[in-house]
């Protein structure tokens, strides 16, 4: 067997244009976001040739997680529509209901939520996520959501909720109930945010994330790619994650599903959608910059080909939503997901990931087995 090579070393089969930059990086798998990537370095990652970027991302993924293993979540809307927020992409906003014609639904009975959670567990999900279209939960809503957390956890599932903004007391109540994850997306960059929503500020989103973090609940926070934002906005979003004291434990990288009747959906449908490869680049850069976070495929997956989804997993995604529906939009079918997992050789994760370790990988550019070493950034 050939000796291990560093992929940053020039050889007859590699393009050396990016050698200097690659040599400046490190993938010490024990690092957290304390090794901060600068905004300039994040931009350089986005500019890498796609194959180089995917190789770096997959190597980092294997140093932090078990190869070919994915975490499966199921998402249920426990209260749908009539949301007072004006998010320009969302069919649940009360501001767009005359155009989207979404049928609003009141809170689902606890027994029906538990039945859905049991079905999710039976089909292989390890985490059950519950979402409500609220600006924030009211005082009368808190006993309901606390009961849901306790009942779902009693089934042996991890729990996640997305209920809008939380204050410190609400976060503490959910933490005491045993909530494992709380989702509150940043959606996009600070500079583009005003093009997306006006009823909730960027800082309010960050405040909720801080309240969740301080309560001891794991943070789930991601974005939506393809809302008309620029690559600079995607760079800024990744950089925003690295400004946090600790990166989110779970990062959904959504691909916009343009919904007719929503301002952003109508604009994207008229002007054209973003390349799927740019979404895949965003996944890969997120994996490199947040090596120990779960990177989840969420909205938008239904429309992708098998090959496009395979590239997303190669880019370091290791989690996805399982089931035929997300909150209000369609999702890839369960039978389709089962078939795709078999074809890709992916297995469902039922336990915590292994400890980080150095893993030899096949250098896709030279054909030799090699150990990718990316350097520490300060």
From Swiss-Prot:
Gene3D superfamilies the record matches: Aldolase class I
Annotated disulfide bonds: none
Annotated GO biological process: biotin biosynthetic process
Top-level taxon of the source organism: Bacteria
UniProt pathway annotation: Cofactor biosynthesis; biotin biosynthesis; biotin from 7,8-diaminononanoate: step 2/2
Xref: Pfam families: BATS, Radical_SAM
Family annotation (CDD domains): Radical_SAM
InterPro entries found in the cross-reference section: Aldolase_TIM (IPR013785), BATS_dom (IPR010722), Biotin_synth/BioAB (IPR002684), Biotin_synthase (IPR024177), Elp3/MiaA/NifB-like_rSAM (IPR006638), rSAM (IPR007197)
Keyword check for Metal-binding: yes
Catalytic activity: (4R,5S)-dethiobiotin + (sulfur carrier)-SH + 2 reduced [2Fe-2S]-[ferredoxin] + 2 S-adenosyl-L-methionine = (sulfur carrier)-H + biotin + 2 5'-deoxyadenosine + 2 L-methionine + 2 oxidized [2Fe-2S]-[ferredoxin]
EC class of the enzyme, as a word: transferase
Cofactor, free-text remark: Binds 1 [4Fe-4S] cluster. The cluster is coordinated with 3 cysteines and an exchangeable S-adenosyl-L-methionine.
A molecular function GO annotation: biotin synthase activity
Residues holding [4Fe-4S] cluster: 83, 87, 90
Tagged with keyword Metal-binding: yes
Known EC number: 2.8.1.6
Radical SAM core domain mapped to chain residues: 68-292
Protein's job: Catalyzes the conversion of dethiobiotin (DTB) to biotin by the insertion of a sulfur atom into dethiobiotin via a radical-based mechanism.
NCBIfam families, sorted: bioB
Subunit structure and binding partners: Homodimer.
Protein name as catalogued: Biotin synthase
UniProt organism field: Psychrobacter arcticus (strain DSM 17307 / VKM B-2377 / 273-4)
